[in-house]
Amino acid sequence: MECTYNLGVRNRSWGLQSSPDSDDLEYTAFERGEGHRRCVRLLTFLKFYREIRKEGPADLDWIQNQGLLAVKLSQIFALRPDMLSIEKCRQLQKMYRNASTIPSEDVERILKEKAPSGFYDSIAWFDEEPLAAASVGQVHRATLTNGEEVVIKVVKADHKERFHRDVKRMMRMMRLAISLSPKLRRVGNPLALLRHVEDYTTRELDLRNEIKGGSELESIQGSLSGDFPMPKLRFPKYYPEMSNEHVLVSEFVRGKTLEECINDESLPWDYLIQLFRIHGAYMFGIGTFHGDLHPGNCIIDEDGCFVFIDNGAICEAPRNVSLSLFNFFEELSKSNHDAAFEALLGIAGQRPNEDRVRRFKSRMAEIYEGFGEKSVGEQSLTDLMMRTVRTAVEDAGADFGEEGFPIIRSLMYMDGLVIRTHPQVKLIA
């Protein structure tokens, strides 16, 4: 779009334009101003992308000032060591729990305005210094009048309107990019990514969804206790009578987040395997899972149990996607490559003709050549997964759908954990 704006000088614009004729002069001041604002938004997006991809540290304060969408996208990039340096990923991962905080006087005001009636009657002590801060809210320690230690999460501000506005603007930019490069829609679809981010972030902005999500995951755990027990998993106790859309009261969990365990190198490989076993049961066995299980959203408590927190973003994976991926990984772990490639064909609406099947399997064989001989540090699983998805879509007609993105994203999270903690591990142990 031409970005013309009036500076009191004839024909000053961002772009190539000859002197305006009489028709050009019919643009209203509003239209010129809107064009200018769109150019500013585009330049802001380009600056954001440069902050993410440039060598050296990103300006985290600047990113946070761009709003909730910028923070959420940065958190996704933080789990892409195949795209960014390990050092850059580690820096961006600070945004999981070390976001900007609310001044203490504003926290008090929010609680007085937003907390349920009778809230203060149950609080014996409240720490004005935040225990942790994330993109949506921040957490403070407190003690109830009955002596129980809790944490109180407070939504930082009314993010919803600006967040949805930013998403719509980004959608317009992505549609333009897709019109120029249609393959973007088929593989690593940025529109699917944005819709996924919009969906789970919108749910995060209503803290009641954390109680609902935690209860749903705990119910699934109970239903699987006979066939697939998960004794190392638990969920925090919530206090629904003291919570609402803006304020959440839950148990104070003594322990360390996975992020803290990574930083002090205290996360053994066998513990990661147990976490993957648990998360995999939800993703592949049930298809309902924690959709934002980054290293800041899982605590290892004093009893060595995994405690899933921030349970507001519960995702559903299409059964044909989750089951096909499970069979793919199972056969791959047995070095049955042809059977693994065959399993992925289940994601296609109908089986492609034999020429396409042969082409698909040939390309997959190239991707997975020497797979079992390489370590995670030598070959990113995320990179392999992206190439696999691309080949499945282009050569086999697979359709992961927008609903399939959360499970791919969860696999990216797990890959990032392994790369940061045990890069020497073989892809097939």
Regions found by a protein language model. Give the residues of each.
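Broad phosphate/nucleotide-binding scaffolds in NTP-utilizing and phosphate-metabolizing enzymes
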Residues: 1-280, 287, 295, 299-323, ...
